[in-house]
């Protein structure tokens, strides 16, 4: 059973990767915990609810449903859930279990962070993207019309329980969206994982258990190491934003309705790779290899009809922009990236246009 420790100045917890771990969820509920509120969506609960019901047998639980979709990742649903928790007897001994994909992880984590100034949360991700990224590291939050995750907080979970078996029924589009995040891990820090994704592509796409378990474990290990080194994104953790600056602009420009988050990140990585080559940070050879691997795990939904100028304007509202300067994570080589600012607007626009083709 791979289990990776996340060590931050305030806390330490396990990110467990194990088939069947959801059935053991009750052992991660601390003694003297009051009522447990499982935050999920109707769709997740319909397909995966029985597994968690078994895992939490004997625990005093309430099930709360969030609306699905990135366009519902707003403050209002969080406030509504908080009201329901009060009505159902929540107090400071209560805790939240986040059971769903990345949107649920973010929103349920944010709910736990602000309810009565903070109660514990247990993260149980049910999509590949959430398992390798969103559930680990304590980032929580919701979107504004202006941009993604502009309201939020850091709130580390008690643990992260990742069960690869739950992905067996995940739709292909959702599965591929998660694979793009794993490609990101390979590009930014894990060259061996990048090579594995290339050589074992057919096994990964076919969801062979040994391949799926390997790429999840390697991605979780990497994320745990980075978060342990830099919880608050002061330095190293910024590399995890590779593809996200451009990707968030694409999501906001399309009102969070046209692309899954992983698909937007895949497009954002393409734009960042083009920009990295234009600015001389990465060789043409490595650039081609990165773009080809992303394409092999495609297709990304068409991005036609989106003005490049609109996307460029959105970059200013990215939460990583400091004093009007957009910070870009650009590739240096496979397994290494760098953070740069002050890139000419003309080059940024050219990179966006190249990625839109």
For each predicted feature, which ranges?
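ATP/NTP phosphate-donor binding region
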Residues: 1-95
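A glycine/threonine-rich phosphate-anchoring loop and its flanking beta-alpha core
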Residues: 7, 16, 110-203
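Catalytic, metal-anchored helix/loop core of enzyme active sites in primary metabolism
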Residues: 9-11, 229-231, 254, 346-357
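Active-site segments that bind and position negatively charged phosphate/pyrophosphate groups
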Residues: 195, 200-309
